[in-house]
């Protein structure tokens, strides 16, 4: 695969994730956009690792760490969202002011 094509794909995924994270008002959608950003970062890690030095696996190892962090976020995030919904009866970001109670 050509490096430029993968970088364009990764930049496109990252841009969609940032746009969704900034404009979404729903916490579940924001978590999904955060996962999209992490996947774009993983794609960059693996691509640069393969392109510059395919014998060393530093990019792949970083990618595994990011996947582990994303898995923890995917497990804890919905639990936090469901807890917020139970307490506030809404998962909209602009309606849930967590500091007022």
Curated annotation (Swiss-Prot):
Q: Tell me the gene name.
A: ndhE
Principal subcellular localisation of the protein = plastid
Task: Check the record and name the InterPro entries matching this protein.
Answer: NADH_UbQ_OxRdtase_chain4L/K, NUOK/Mnh_C1-like
| Topology of this chain in the membrane | Multi-pass membrane protein
Any one GO biological process: photosynthesis, light reaction
Please describe what this protein does.
Answer: NDH shuttles electrons from NAD(P)H:plastoquinone, via FMN and iron-sulfur (Fe-S) centers, to quinones in the photosynthetic chain and possibly in a chloroplast respiratory chain. The immediate electron acceptor for the enzyme in this species is believed to be plastoquinone. Couples the redox reaction to proton translocation, and thus conserves the redox energy in a proton gradient.
Q: Which cysteines are joined by disulfide bonds?
A: none
Membrane-crossing ranges are 2-22, 32-52, 61-81
What cellular component terms from Gene Ontology apply here? chloroplast thylakoid membrane; NADH dehydrogenase complex
- Protein name in UniProt: NAD(P)H-quinone oxidoreductase subunit 4L, chloroplastic
